[in-house]
Structures are given as structure tokens and as C-alpha cells.
Swiss-Prot record:
Annotated localization: Nucleus; Cytoplasm
Tissues in which the UniProt entry reports expression: Expressed in fast and slow myotomal muscle, heart, liver, skin, brain and testis.
Annotated protein name in UniProt: Muscleblind-like protein 2a
InterPro entries: Znf-CCCH_Muscleblind-like, Znf_CCCH
Stored PANTHER family: MUSCLEBLIND-LIKE PROTEIN, MUSCLEBLIND-LIKE PROTEIN 2
Family: Belongs to the muscleblind family.
Record flagged with keyword RNA-binding: yes
One Pfam family in the UniProt entry: zf-CCCH
Function: Involved in pre-mRNA alternative splicing regulation. RNA-binding protein that binds to 5'ACACCC-3' core sequence.
UniProt entry keywords in alphabetical sequence: Cytoplasm, Metal-binding, mRNA processing, mRNA splicing, Nucleus, Repeat, RNA-binding, Zinc, Zinc-finger
GO cellular component assignments: cytoplasm; nucleoplasm
Lineage: Eukaryota, Metazoa, Chordata, Craniata, Vertebrata
Amino acid sequence: MALNIASIRDTKWLTLEVCRQFQRGTCSRSDEECKFAHPPKSCQVENGRVIACFDSLKGRCTRENCKYLHPPAHLKTQLEINGRNNLIQQKTAAAMLAQQMQFMIPSTTMQHVQTFPVNQGLGSSAGLSYTPYLTPMSHSMGLVPTDILPSTPVIVPGSPPVSVTAGSSSNQKLLRTDKLEVCREFQRGNCARGETDCRFAHPSDSPMIDTSDNTVTVCMDYIKSRCSREKCKYFHPPAHLQAKVKAAQHQANQTAVAAQAAATAAAMTQSTAKAMKRPLEATVDLAFPHSGLQPLPKRPALEKSNGSSSLFNPSVLHYQQALANAQLQQPAFFPTGSVLCMTPASSLGRS
């Protein structure tokens, strides 16, 4: 089914409002100055609006008395902007409609999508698999032979936990913008670069050096030009190192703002999920739709009531197995014997 919305000409973006003062003959502005249209007598005006000539915008109108408005330069620019916005809206609407029609119209074509693993140490059995094809049929849960079912309870795993402790130490190290590394060559006394040229710190006093990581703490008051201490215990860096500290602070601030925005978005997502009316039932419905559980068929009445009605019915077993698996709280029970060897209950009435 081919749908081409872009081929339909939409004249709304070509519509301009006519100047009311011009209609009364009292407009003091010219056609090039007034923000409303001044159409000639040959143009058709309906409800105080006039349609601009599309060919005139392209510079190819050859009509002598065109019934559409040939707008001036400033109105032509406005119409071009309206046309671009209208084209974007048409493309967006066409894409959304095509996506909706893909799911509404059944077809035999199966589109292959990227597969994803579902065996996180739990569902490694061959009986639990997911097809990588999208079909018009809804997903459902089916019963499989008991010999290929896993012995452990089957649960639906959620999102794997994400560990953030690995990069915590490195992030803390990067967030310390008030420290500079001390030049090791300067400590040995053979640094050929001067204090204003070396990219590492050249502290005058050794007590201010932190021996654990060979760094020195920068005086932030000196960076802001307001340190009034006579003997400051913090390092007063030169101009090029001050610029380095300020750049590191700016980057740290941007990182903090981005992290705060991400945390706010995550909190809003969690609050939206908690505000759902039926979060648990919706999850169960998505995992196991109602199409997988067929209604329990009515058992035909028996002529004899000599205890034969208490025999086992295979259809009841299948329904109970599906219900037990849908609860996801306890392992499903499967009998060891085969249900095919049992005599159907309907054949007992003829004996």
C-alpha cells in the first residue's frame, strides 16, 4: 500500500492575511513596508485572506492576470520559511503513518531484527527460545516436552545491574581540580625549565607537598586574587598553571551539571514507572499474554458415576502447567509419566 502525502498540495502555508486598512483605502504603508498583503483586484480574497502564487515564489509565473498574489520580498521570505516548516511536518507525518500501517496491515513478510540473549544463567534450556522474526501474530506461551525443560525455576530476568564502582576512584581523582602534580625533575634539582615554563608545579616549600600522590594543593584564594595570608600553606601557581586550574574547574562543573541532569532524568523515569496504575499486571501481561492461556473446555457429562469421573484429564494438566508458569514465584510441577498413555474420559461411558 503506497501512501504519498507529500504529493498533496497544501495551500495553508501560502495563505496571507490581507491588510484591512488597505481594503478600506486608508493604509499609509506601501506594499514593500506593510506586514500584511496588498492584493490587486485580480486576486481572489476570501474571508480576509489571499493565497500567494507558488509559481511566483519560484520565479516562473507567466500569467497576465494571475488570480494569486505575487508577494513582495519581505512576505516572500516569510512564505519560504512557512514552506520549509510545512515540508518537515509532512515528512514527519508520513513517517509516523508508515510506521503505524506496518503494524496494522498483516502481511506474510517477516522482517529480521537483531536478536538478544535471554539466557543469563537461568534459561539455558532449548525449550526456552525467542524467535528473531516479527510476525503479525501476538506472542504467546506454549507448552514443551518435560524432558527439555530446565530443572530450576524459570523466572524472567530484569535488567542486569550496572556497576559504577570501577571508575569511582578515577572520577574522584579527576574531580580534584585544586591539586597540581609536582615536577619530579625540580625535586631532583635538575629541571631545565623555569617556573613559568614547566607544566608541573615548582613549590618553594617542601612541607606543602603531599607525599602520597606527589601533588600540591593550590590556593584558590590566590586564583581569585584575594589571598591575604603572609605565609600561605597552599601553592601559588604562575599564570599558565592558573589557566590550567581554571580550565579543569570549568570541565568539572560541566561534568557535574551533566551528571545532575542524568540523575534528574532517571528519577523522573522511576517516578513515572511508580505512578503507573497497574505496574505488576502490565508486566505480567507483556511477558505472558492472555492468548497463551486458552479457556478451560467443558468436560462432557458421564453416564456412569462409579468413580470414573475422578480420572485424570490431560487438558486440565496443560492448563494448570500454564498457570503455574505464569505465576513466576514457584517452580512448575510436571508429572513424570506420559499423559498420552491415559485413557480419555469420554471413552468410559461406552463400557
